[in-house]
Amino acid sequence: MTEFVVLIPARLDSSRLPGKALADIHGKPMVVRVAEQAAKSKAARVVVATDHPDIQTVCQAHGIEAVMTSNRHESGTTRLAEASAALKLPPHLIVVNVQGDEPLIAPELIDRTAEVLVENNVQMATAAHELHDFDELMNPNAVKVVLDKNRNAIYFSRAPIPYLRDAMRAGKREMPSETAVLRHIGIYAYRAGFLQRYAEMSVSPLETIESLEQLRVLWHGYPIAVETAKEAPAAGVDTQEDLDRVRAVFQTV
């Protein structure tokens, strides 16, 4: 398999769950749990990119490499662009972006996302899974993605896409039988050189409207290959309820 590294963007500020990167999960901070899970993948290196010295200190205390970045980044991808430059990663090296609030992420998904980047010879790759719940389709916190015939992303949106016209007209809460509805999984793979290019691209209007960083890539004309996972991954941590659920999982391990 082609060599890759995992970079984990982790900021201390969080509107819905303040300080969640340092939230305790069965004796260890969440960011440490994420890094340990990422280390179970085939990554040659796992590095946390953070904006706060407390996170860096905690990571280093647990033997995890961490690099400081600016606290002015609007997205995890631009944070990783700064981190990859600071780490002097070669332009061809594959970087997998694992979100800092995913302590249950499957190592196999990390590996597969890196593989998809290489197999499709694209600048960026990500993942999705089939959605079967109507309420989740309508939920703006569940990002949807539609693909072309080559399994590249056409668009990502918080809106319900594809729009189920006939079902909506009839007032039915039905999922389509003609095609799968896909929910985006927040994991990305790209080469370090493309990370620098991303940071230099102008911000797209759609990226701002939807608050979805990956739309910058589509806006500038680059394809994004999408791996369809066989099952939905464990949910990340956005709320106190999410944190309680994850803590319960680790208590049983």
From Swiss-Prot:
Pathway of action: Nucleotide-sugar biosynthesis; CMP-3-deoxy-D-manno-octulosonate biosynthesis; CMP-3-deoxy-D-manno-octulosonate from 3-deoxy-D-manno-octulosonate and CTP: step 1/1; Bacterial outer membrane biogenesis; lipopolysaccharide biosynthesis
InterPro entries found in the cross-reference section: Cytidylyl_trans, KdsB, Nucleotide-diphossugar_trans
What's the domain of life for this entry? Bacteria
Q: Give an example GO cellular component term for this record.
A: cytosol
Reaction it catalyzes: 3-deoxy-alpha-D-manno-oct-2-ulosonate + CTP = CMP-3-deoxy-beta-D-manno-octulosonate + diphosphate
- Pfam families reported for this sequence: CTP_transf_3
The EC designation for this entry is 2.7.7.38
The protein's predominant localisation is: cytoplasm
Described function: Activates KDO (a required 8-carbon sugar) for incorporation into bacterial lipopolysaccharide in Gram-negative bacteria.
What is this protein's record name?
A: 3-deoxy-manno-octulosonate cytidylyltransferase
Please name the source species: Neisseria meningitidis serogroup C (strain 053442)
